[in-house]
Amino acid sequence: MREYAVFTSESVSEGHPDKMADQISDAILDAILKEDPYARVACETLVKTGAVVLAGEITTTANIDVEAVVRQTVNGIGYHHSDLGFDGSTCAVINMIGKQSPEIAQGVDRQKPEDQGAGDQGLMFGYASRETDVLMPAPISYAHRLMERQAELRRSGALPWLRPDAKSQVTFAYENGKPVRLDAVVLSTQHDPEITQTQLKEAVIEEIIKPIIPAEMFHAATKFHINPTGMFVIGGPVGDCGLTGRKIIVDTYGGMARHGGGAFSGKDPSKVDRSAAYAGRYVAKNIVAAGLADKCEIQVSYAIGVAEPTSISINTFGTAKVSDELIIQLVREHFDLRPFGITRMLNLIQPMYKQTAAYGHFGREGSNTAFTWEKTDKVEALKDAAGL
């Protein structure tokens, strides 16, 4: 397959309306999991001027103050005053959440936990490559870091005129499958009305972009598009409606890898849309970290109510040191990809999800309590089994 000559990925800030919705959904999930680790949660959020609307299906013994969780989340993002067009303390919160269908529950729940069926049919992908030190594609990795930097400078007061809503887009030129130079950066950020566009552009380039992207990636023809439409004072849910699950490419690999179509936020680990995508990243990252391949994409698929995956496929794009067939065999031997196995393997029944809902679910620092799918604790076992 021909390699891309250039590749572009985008990210959005925590104050982008779609990401607000994701964070609210995951904040509710976390609050429930604190009281009921085995709850069934599918929480969807819509945000628009002056209102947060919740819908979905939740079955739980937890008793949480949903409205308080919503308000705390919105205020924490930075929408805490009417001057910003949205105030978490005064916005309407409309709760339309119901219970999960018993027909779904009978297909998922089992007497033996290991036999837990998948919560739905579907296909999920995981990916890793040696482009960056976190084994992620460079465009999405740097796009996320730019948005984190924008939030850091906003929260610290270093650039006090910044507001919560922002977007980034990064284009790298590639040679022999590796990023070699920065072709273009697009960064649009909401701001106070007093700041001039000249001041804004200089600050964004010098204080946000240059500290994040390695100096050797810049070249004379690198293009900067900073707030290219000019003023960006009206933003967040006033400017656009936000919905849970509308940034699935931002959440994953920036388009560099395939996507099965299922969103993550607001879903408990019994939903393989989320848990199997996390497991796919865990598998692919350990394969690349172990040196079995320089690039790896895995696809897994499921049938509702069935524990074992209906398929496991691997693509190493010609970079493998062993056969793809051997890698699939090693995946089956070293990774339990049944829904319960994934939850146990990655310690997913814990309230850690809100922090995943902005700046990407992958390429973050992994630990035993957060982003567990980023750990590379299978490397030695894979090396030994592959004879490397």
From Swiss-Prot:
UniProt pathway annotation: Amino-acid biosynthesis; S-adenosyl-L-methionine biosynthesis; S-adenosyl-L-methionine from L-methionine: step 1/1
Residues reported in the UniProt entry to bind ATP: H16, D165, A166, K167, D240, R246, K247, A263, K267
One GO MF term attached to the UniProt entry: magnesium ion binding
Catalysed transformations (reactions): L-methionine + ATP + H2O = S-adenosyl-L-methionine + phosphate + diphosphate
Cofactor: Mg(2+); K(+)
Binding residues for Mg(2+): D18
An individual GO BP term: S-adenosylmethionine biosynthetic process
Family: Belongs to the AdoMet synthase family.
Protein name per UniProt: S-adenosylmethionine synthase
Species per Swiss-Prot/TrEMBL record: Acinetobacter baumannii (strain AYE)
Lineage: Bacteria, Pseudomonadati, Pseudomonadota, Gammaproteobacteria, Moraxellales
